[in-house]
Structures are given as C-alpha cells and as structure tokens.
C-alpha cells in the first residue's frame, strides 16, 4: 500500500488517458491533478507527442516545473531545477529525427513501402487528422528523435517493414492512433527509469511510482512502474503486461480522463 503523502511520482500518458481521444478534454481528471499538485507530487507526462506539444500541454494542465517524457521516451525534457545535468534542457536518445527520416525515405523509394509521415503533409492536414488547431498541429511536426506516420500498406508488408527497421537499429511502435519510428535503444521505460533514478539521487530515497496508459506503447512504461492503471482505450491491441497482479494493476471501466480519475480513486481513495 502507499499514500499520497509518501515520496511519489505519477507517470501519465496523454491521448486516450489523461486527455479524451477526440475532444482532448481533461476536466474529469482536474480534481486529482489539483490534489496531487497541492501534495507536491510530480505528475510526469509521458507520450509520443513532441516536446514542444507537451510543454504547451504541461502549462495548460498546471504541471510545470517537472520533467516530461516525449516521443515515446526518445526525448526527456528536464525539470527546470535540473540545469546542472548534462544535456539540459533536453536529453535525446539515439539517432535524430532527420536521420530517421532519411532511412524512411530510402525504404519508401527503394522497397516501395506505403506510408505517410507528418513530414509529408502540412499543419492543416494534421489538424484534419487530429482535430487540433493549426497552431497546435504545427507543434506535432517538431520531432527531434522520432517520426510519426500513418501506415497505408498491408499487414504482411508491415511485418517486412518492421524487420527492416530492426535491422537498421530502429523500432516501429504503435500508439493510440498513429505509428512511430524511433531508435531501438529508446523507450518510455528507459526514460522513466532514468527519471526515477534522478529523483532518488536528489532525495536519497526511491519514490513509489504510479503509471497510467491506454495503448500498446505504454506497456514498457507500465512494466517498470510499481503500480499501473490501464485505462480502457480505443486500440484493438490493448495493453498486456507480464505482471498483472491485481494488487499492482487496475484496468478501468471508463475511458480517457474519466478512467484516469477512476484509477487514482482506486489506488488512493480505497486506501
């Protein structure tokens, strides 16, 4: 058991978890966000989104001053008070967005895989795909260490594409709505472990951790967290963990921010 008073870190996915997948509303989670903020519990956003997108959302949600994990763990945006850490303000894992884009363009030209990346279109098109404003959609294109795409080929070709990426030291990851290509060494789990270790080094005590997510790309994060909330999501693959002990893992009945609130209610209000 744990409480909101003890050293605690909360890691949360965004789309489909803290944010509604369609409206991006987060108000059902607002009371818990306020309570965590008042208790000085860091809520660390962890998403496939770019750092630019997440900094905007972090401010909107009132969660400034703590680190965040962007681009599925390929980018760690450091906390404001961590200016002495090498790499400040961001730590980039693996190869850059530009290098990944070159690899993808070569595979598309030479092996004729069919996909559309966010680099292939303008912000108006991304706004149509996502329901974001054009200014917010423009932030989705500011990748530093990954590429986001829509797959437009067969499942068989996807398997071939994934194998080719793996040969080249890259991974192909499914998010709530889009696919993401990033360095094979990067991941939400790696980024979370680094942040946990940093907090432990600064405080002298390992914090208890709680994570929330709804998609397959959240599984690595939830595997390394002490307690996990799997928010009911839209993805047909769902989230499957190696350790689904009910004492550690709670699957919500509700979706999005209502599921987020349900998960917090389960692990805190019941204790």
Curated annotation (Swiss-Prot):
Active site residues according to the UniProt entry: 13 (nucleophile)
Coiled coil: none
InterPro entries reported for this sequence: HAD-like_sf, HAD-SF-IIB-MPGP, HAD-SF_hydro_IIB, HAD_sf, MPG_Pase
Co-factor requirement: Mg(2+)
Catalyzed reactions: 2-O-(alpha-D-mannosyl)-3-phosphoglycerate + H2O = (2R)-2-O-(alpha-D-mannosyl)-glycerate + phosphate
Enzyme Commission designation: 3.1.3.70
Subcellular location: Cytoplasm
Classification lineage: Bacteria, Pseudomonadati, Pseudomonadota, Gammaproteobacteria, Enterobacterales
UniProt keyword Secreted present: no
Organism from which the protein derives: Shigella boydii serotype 18 (strain CDC 3083-94 / BS512)
Entry similarity comment: Belongs to the HAD-like hydrolase superfamily. MPGP family.
GO cellular component: cytosol
Entry-linked NCBIfam families: HAD-SF-IIB, HAD-SF-IIB-MPGP, MPGP_rel, PRK03669.1
Chain sites annotated for binding Mg(2+): 13, 15, 214
Domain of life: Bacteria
Membrane keyword on record: no
Keywords (A to Z) from UniProt: Cytoplasm, Hydrolase, Magnesium, Metal-binding
Entry's Gene Ontology BP terms: mannosylglycerate biosynthetic process
Name of the protein in question: Mannosyl-3-phosphoglycerate phosphatase
Listed GO MF terms: magnesium ion binding; mannosyl-3-phosphoglycerate phosphatase activity
